[in-house]
């Protein structure tokens, strides 16, 4: 079973938000998933990104591959969570 981290669409017509899920790569986009590991809402300003970092790390260590979009979201969330470097 090839596990991937990808987005599953939720919300209403013209007002989507997405769940970040761990799922088998053969399942449909909005089909069954193994675990819900976060939320991404691009319609809010600033964008709403809530991730269960420990669970995402678990799935990545177990061999899950993130989709391109999820990889971008993870980088953006890591950058936002990192403390700003002090200016010398």
From Swiss-Prot:
Family matches, as InterPro entries: Ribosomal_bS16, Ribosomal_bS16_dom_sf
Gene3D superfamilies: 3.30.1320.10
Record keywords: Ribonucleoprotein, Ribosomal protein
One of the record's GO cellular component terms: small ribosomal subunit
Gene Ontology molecular-function annotations: structural constituent of ribosome
Gene Ontology biological process terms, A to Z: translation
Family label: Belongs to the bacterial ribosomal protein bS16 family.
HAMAP family: Ribosomal_bS16 (MF_00385)
Protein name: Small ribosomal subunit protein bS16
Lineage start: Bacteria, Pseudomonadati, Myxococcota, Myxococcia, Myxococcales
């Amino acid at each position: 079973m090839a596990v991937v981290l990808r987005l599953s669409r939720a919300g209403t017509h013209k007002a989507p938000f997405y769940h970040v899920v761990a799922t088998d790569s053969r399942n449909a986009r909005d089909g069954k998933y193994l675990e819900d590991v976060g939320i991404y809402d691009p319609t809010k300003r600033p964008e709403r990104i809530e991730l269960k970092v420990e669970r995402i790390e678990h799935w990545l260590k177990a061999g899950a591959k993130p989709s391109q979009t999820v990889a971008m979201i993870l980088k953006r969330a890591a950058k936002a969570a990192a403390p700003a470097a002090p200016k010398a």
